[in-house]
Amino acid sequence: ALSDLESGIGGEVTSSGMAAVTLIANTLRLNSKVILPHDCYGGTIRLFTSLKEKGVLDVYFTDQSDLIALEKTFEEINPDLVWIETPSNPLLQVVDIEQIAQKAKLHHSLVVVDNTFLSPVLQNPLLLGADIVMHSSTKYINGHSDIVGGAVITNNEEILTDLKFWANNLGITGAPFDSYLTLRGLRTLSIRMEKHEKNAAAIVELLSNSDKIKTVYYPGLLNH
C-alpha cells in the first residue's frame, strides 16, 4: 500500500526509521562516495559519520539549498549516492528534489529521499527523479504513536532485489503486527496530514506574533 502511494514498484518494511537508513547504507560498496545534507536527521548524521570514520564510506555533508556549491561538489567527487531530506529535521530546510536529481543523473548517482516529514500525501520523490524513498513510519505514516518502524521503497527492479537481499541478511525487517498497525494508520493518512497542516499554521501564526519568539522555522512562511 505504501509503495503504491509513493508510485514505487516495491520495497521493504523495516523495524525502525534508522533501520531503513542502515539498510540503504548496506547496499553501498566499500568506499562509495555519499553526499548528505548538512542539517539532516541526527541519527542519519551519526550513522554515516561513523561509517566514514571506520573507512567504510566517503561522506560529504553539504548545504543542498546552494545549488552552485552542490554542483561543485558533484564535479569534485562524482558521488555514488546523494541523500536528500526535505523538509529537513529539525530546521525544515526545503530543497528542490527534481533539480538535484537531474544533476545526480548526469553523474550516474543514485538519489535517496527521506520523505518522513511530508509523507506521500504531500510529496512523491520517485516522481521527481529519486531512485529510493524512505520513511520513519513511526511518525506520520503510522500516526498513532504505538509502533516503531520504517520503510524503503524504489521504482527500480535491481535496487529492489538488493534491498530485499540486505534486509534479509541484516534481519531488520518489520514485525507483522507493527505492519498491520501501520496499514491501519495509512487509511487515515490523508485526513491527518490535512489537519496537521491546519494545526501547524495556527501555531506558527501565534508564535510569529509573539515578541518572546525570535525565529520561527516553518516552510509556509514567506521568509523561510
Predicted regions and their residues:
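Aromatic- and Gly/Pro-rich amphipathic surface segment
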Residues: 1-6
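Conserved PLP-enzyme active-site core in the AAT-like
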Residues: 11-212, 217, 222-223
